[in-house]
């Protein structure tokens, strides 16, 4: 949340979590920074909506509610939940075009999360392939097979600056912490 925001808003949409986990997720960035609140951080849990309602809600928040305010980062955790079927070419193209339009019109970065196929590192479905082709950076998180409890973060590809692979673990309080004795993949 700190970064180089310069007063811009961070808007986080979660499509999968139930209210208990969504609430914990919404509070985590504030706790990590030692803040009680941040008027520029907005979190929305969309689990109970269908895919069309989710798209319309996101459009409303970005293009109506915060229309005249500077948005720096939009996080959509659950891009697959913006379509009825991740292999539907038409819906996948619509979502890809929506994301590109929003990032262009709002002059902001949009980060989406999409799962990979089982037994593969490829993003799920036609939607995953479409987003992969247009993304600025593709970052993969996976459970570390050597050190249990660690999550390894790898920059699979980037149009600009890549970063070195690193790992983190969750502390007892549920907050992530970089692992100092990380290993090379």
Residue ranges and their predicted role:
Residues 1:
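P-loop NTPase nucleotide-binding module
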Residues 4-90, 94, 171-175, 181-183:
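Conserved inter-motif catalytic segment of the P-loop NTP-binding fold
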